[in-house]
From Swiss-Prot:
Stored InterPro entries: FHIPEP_1 (IPR042194), FHIPEP_3 (IPR042193), FHIPEP_4 (IPR042196), FHIPEP_CS (IPR025505), FlhA (IPR006301), T3SS_FHIPEP (IPR001712)
Protein family: Belongs to the FHIPEP (flagella/HR/invasion proteins export pore) family.
A GO CC term assigned to this protein in UniProt: plasma membrane
Organism per entry: Bacillus subtilis (strain 168)
Protein name: Flagellar biosynthesis protein FlhA
Keywords for the protein's UniProt record, in alphabetical order: Bacterial flagellum biogenesis, Bacterial flagellum protein export, Cell membrane, Membrane, Protein transport, Transmembrane, Transmembrane helix, Transport
A Pfam family hit: FHIPEP
Compartments where found: Cell membrane
Membrane topology of the entry: Multi-pass membrane protein
Function, in words: Involved in the export of flagellum proteins.
Cited PROSITE patterns: FHIPEP
GO biological process, one term: bacterial-type flagellum assembly
Transmembrane segments: 6-22, 27-43, 52-68, 104-120, 189-205, 230-246, 275-291
Length: 677
């Protein structure tokens, strides 16, 4: 235990001891001086802080200081009633401060109580309640704002974590202050009751036990009690003032003194007006110019000084700003910063700004946060922050999505319309602006809100603009997810897996497979929309086969077969037949014969007429399935699967190509078409 911790514990024990153990008057005097000093230090600290959280210990400190002050009250009361003395400090405040006049002392004490209890304490208590309520109410909004800034790339993950912690600390602090302000209120009430008890029982004890007359007892004990009351209420008043400063303090870049002088005297012209008013007050009233003249002159001089220094500061700021701009242009770092490319960028025209502006009801930022979470669960990949910005070069209603600086999607939105898609494309039952749904290329119409209900009743799928663009972003990120996983992202996934499966990771990397080898396998899986969330199974497979080969194509095939249950669930519905298009024996033989083996790996080399024949056959089968509104899935034998995919990828990028080993044995498969040559 450190010395600081020990000193605090000893202090608390001494405070408790004050309640039960009689202390000599000289020790009480020292403790009273310490009490006043602590109260003054707390007040000065609150005035010097820039935000409330810089003094987050204040609620607990307030409790300890209140307990300390009440312990002093109990000890001084015991000393006054038992021995008729309260120590040098109490006697000094009773005689010197109030001039030895009991009535004056009582009046001063009552005024202090009124100031503390009715003015400062009551106000601080109310402000604490309101601050706590509004802080708690604002928490969800602040959290959403942090997520939006993180999603827009304005802050890093570390900064977002720090801000979230700060929001939580603010809520805890103001919640604690709401309760701690009751200590101050209770302390003021206790001070009044203690003074009344001291006076009444002091007179009784003086008369019955010490043989004093009622006048002597009243004078002696009232003087000591008033001194004790004032000496305890002064630090109490300082603490109450500190409480008020803490709960009313807004976060700023300077302390209280800096902010007061900076804001109160921010407009020198107003000081001239105040100086003239004070001068006129002395001229036209009996107050006299001798009293008002010096103050008016001081205000006028201050206004002149502030005005002059303000102009000089503006000139200096302009010069420094110009120099900074020149230095920035000359700096090589300013050019280097231009080389940075954001992984994902979403740009939109000025007409779509309401989509991203929360003040105008836009929730695009929140939707993108949800998209990143959804894709993390679905793909097993942490999607980078999406940089969102408006682009004046685009049409007002136009947007585009870039991945690593390359445009991958583009579209237009009508914010005051809804996108309606008919279940049967040939239907034309509602009026609207003809368009194409951007995510899946379906025919659609932009309809006004007036016909939205009618479209719903007719069976149309009606979607708002924000949902349209969110779906478009989601599908395009899925389509290009393999471009977003590099070696750095792969290393992060490996490190995360290593926390739970260190032995497995050590068996795979750095030997026999490098981070680059693993990255290629993960990218190939994502390219065919296979989730990499099950990293344990993927690494188990790589551990088994990585010793045999480092060919990323072969490792990917082994991994796909290990993920058979996942792939089956992705394409086959439970208790339903999986309808597929199969490859004929001639097609598979032609592809197998066309595989060329080299020292750098295998590749497919087919005669142009054979390739063209296979592509035409696949196109024919896909068209027939499309007319029947069925999904096309191509099934072939394991040895040729990856070569079939390579052949068809250019023409049918979204066509799933599966092998028999990638489907579980309990899945019923039905061939509804054959690819032949």
């Amino acid at each position: 235990m450190s010395t600081r911790d020990l000193s605090v514990l000893i202090s608390v024990v001494l405070i408790v001891a004050m309640l039960v153990i009689p202390f000599p008057p000289w020790l009480l005097s020292i403790l009273i001086i310490i009490n006043i000093s602590l109260a003054l230090i707390v007040l000065l600290t609150t005035m010097n802080m820039q935000e409330a959280l810089q003094f987050s210990i204040f609620p607990s400190l307030l409790l300890l200081l209140t307990l300390f002050r009440l312990g002093l009250n109990v000890s001084t009361t015991r000393s006054i009633l038992s021995h008729g003395e309260g120590g040098k400090v109490v006697e000094t405040f009773g005689n010197f401060v109030v001039g030895g006049n009991v009535l004056v002392g009582l009046v001063v004490f009552i005024i202090l109580i009124i100031i503390q209890f009715i003015v400062i304490t009551k106000g601080a208590e109310r402000v604490s309640e309101v601050a706590a309520r509004f802080t708690l109410d604002a928490m969800p909004g602040k959290q959403m704002s942090i997520d939006a800034d993180l999603n827009a790339g304005m802050i890093t993950e570390q900064e977002a974590k720090h801000r979230r912690e700060k929001v939580a600390r603010e809520a805890d602090f103001y919640g604690a202050m709401d309760g701690a302000s009751k200590f101050v209120k209770g302390d003021a009430i206790a001070g009044i009751i203690i003074v009344m008890i001291n006076i009444i029982f002091g007179i009784v004890i003086g008369m019955l036990q010490q043989g004093m007359s009622i006048q002597e007892a009243a004078s002696h004990f009232t003087m000591l009690t008033v001194g004790d009351g004032i000496v305890s209420q002064i630090p109490a008043l300082l603490i109450s003032t500190a409480t008020g400063i803490v709960v009313t303090r807004a976060a700023s870049e300077g302390n209280l003194g800096h902010d007061i002088t900076g804001q109160l005297f921010a407009y020198p012209k107003l000081l001239y007006v105040a100086a003239a008013t004070i001068m006129l007050l002395g001229i036209f009233t009996p107050i006299g110019i001798l009293l008002t003249g010096p103050l008016a002159g001081l205000l006028a001089f201050g206004a002149y000084t502030l005005s002059k220094s303000g102009k000089e500061k503006e000139e200096v700021d302009e010069i420094l700003e110009e120099e900074a701009e020149v230095d920035e242009l000359k700096s090589p770092e300013s050019v280097v910063q231009l080389l940075h490319i954001d992984p994902i960028e979403f740009e939109f025209g000025y007409g779509l700004i309401p989509l991203a502006d929360a003040n105008q009801g836009g929730d695009l930022l929140d939707r993108i946060v949800m998209i990143r979470r959804q894709l993390a669960l679905e793909l097993g990949l942490v999607i980078p922050v999406v940089r969102i910005r408006d682009n004046i070069a685009l049409q007002p209603n136009e947007y585009r999505l870039k991945i690593k600086g390359n445009e991958v999607a583009k579209g237009e939105l009508l914010l005051d319309h809804y996108l309606a898609m008919s279940p049967t494309p040939e239907d034309d039952l509602i009026e609207g602006i003809e368009t194409v749904e951007p995510s899946f290329g379906l025919p659609a119409k932009w309809i006004s809100e007036a016909v939205k209900d009618e479209a719903d009743m007719l069976g149309y799928t009606v979607v708002d603009p924000a949902s349209v663009v969110s779906t478009h972003i989601t599908e395009k990120i899925k389509q290009h997810a393999h471009e977003l996983i590099g070696r750095q992202e792969t290393k992060q996934l490996i490190d995360h897996l290593k926390e739970s499966y260190p032995v497995l990771v050590e068996e795979v990397t750095p030997n026999p497979l490098s981070v680059g080898d693993i990255q290629k396998v993960l990218a190939k899986l994502l390219k065919e929309k296979v989730s990499i969330r099950n990293l344990v199974t993927i690494f188990e497979t790589l551990a088994d086969y990585g010793k045999l080969t480092t060919d990323s194509d072969l490792l990917t095939e082994y991994t796909r077969q290990a993920l058979a249950k996942q792939i089956t669930a992705q394409f086959a519905k439970e208790n339903e037949v999986l309808k597929v298009v199969t490859c004929s024996g001639r097609v598979e033989k032609a592809i197998a014969d066309g595989v060329q083996q080299t020292e750098h790996g295998n590749y497919l080399s087919l005669e142009p007429d054979i390739s063209e024949s296979i592509v035409r056959s696949v196109a024919k089968e896909a068209e027939q399935l499309s007319l029947r509104q069925e999904t096309a899935i191509l099934l072939c034998s394991p040895p040729v699967r990856m070569y079939v995919k390579q052949l068809l990828e250019r023409y049918f990028p979204d066509l799933p190509v599966l092998s028999y080993n990638e489907l579980e044995a309990n899945v019923e498969v039905q061939s509804i078409g054959v690819v032949d040559i």
